[in-house]
């Protein structure tokens, strides 16, 4: 799939993999790669179909189980995700990071951090999230600072500031997050992380 590795546009990648499937219908890899593209496009039902086809052809294809595990996380089915990552790992794939993500949702924050940072740099959103949930606020703040500034990372910074009672900083980050992504208004409105700010005129002005 060298040609697809040179292509950045998802639609074009998808066409390359579809052509490969038509040309080599008994090769599992194009099905798996097309499934990965479908995940990126948000078409999870189609992705599962393609990945299961890949496994029917080659039930030792670790990436197919790994990608099905990613879909399971998206669908909030963490037990299935853990099982699929275990299968992928037994077939030789490094699944530390994805297992770490599962452990965030299971509430095993320290384990999640250790798994996600074992083979990856600390500069990662999910690492910062796990550190925040594990109440390691100083470390979490340093981690999130190295990330690209967008609505999601600014919102996490607002949460960290709210948890450490720095209301001014929380409002500042929240305002910047909303400016980046207006949908954050509705999220913040109902988020108990900001419960102690709900009656503040500055907060109300941000979420109106």
How does the language model describe each region?
Residues 1-7, 29, 122:
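Amphipathic alpha-helical repeat scaffolds of TPR domains
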Residues 2, 33, 67, 98, ...:
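Canonical tetratricopeptide repeat
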Residues 7-19, 40-53, 74-87, 91-92, ...:
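Structural signature of tandem alpha-helical TPR/SEL1-like repeats
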Residues 23, 57, 88-91, 118-119, ...:
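Structural marker of alpha-solenoid helical repeat scaffolds
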Residues 29, 63, 94-97, 122, ...:
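Start-of-helix register in tetratricopeptide repeats
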Residues 150-180:
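Sterile Alpha Motif
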Residues 183-208:
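Terminal, low-structured helical/coil segments at or just beyond the last alpha-helical repeat
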